[in-house]
Amino acid sequence: MKKQKQNLLAKFVRSLGFYLFATGAVFAHHSFPATYVMDETATIEGTMVQFLFRNPHSFVHVMVSDKETGESQRWAVEWGGASALAGSVDRSSLKPGDQVRISGQPGRNPEDHRIRMQSLEVIDGDFVWEGDFD
């Protein structure tokens, strides 16, 4: 009987440890404030060069001309996953060459050229998206 209680306790401790590890990994994965400045908004305009429509997060890559130097910089724009965006976005919503205007929360490190998307507009097009994907 004592052995059964010890085994039950050991299983409980292992299960609890796994649960704590797994939930910590989920929170770390979705820690947008660690990567983005949540109370600021930045807007970029440029040419969309790549659209990765996938889970768990989609990405739009945009070439943006630096206003001071004139040099082009590739920006990575994080978006919701394909399943979260279903119904409002699909693989044909954006195509390379589209001129886009994107607003969102800027990355903490300006040299990373990152934004967490809050809105997207295809300039001279008919596609507009606004929302949240938490």
What are these regions (language model features)?
Residues 74-90:
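Beta-strand/loop nucleic-acid-binding surfaces
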Residues 27-42:
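Short boundary/loop segments of OB/S1/cold-shock single-stranded nucleic-acid-binding domains
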Residues 43, 70-74:
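Short, mixed charged/polar active-site loops
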Residues 3, 11-25:
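Bacterial N-terminal signal peptides
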Residues 107-133:
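OB-fold/S1-family single-stranded nucleic acid-binding modules
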Residues 44-48:
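Conserved hydrophobic positions within beta-strands
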Residues 86-102:
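Short nucleic-acid-contacting surface segments enriched for D/E, G, S/T with interspersed K/R
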Residues 54-65:
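Short aromatic-glycine-enriched beta-strand elements
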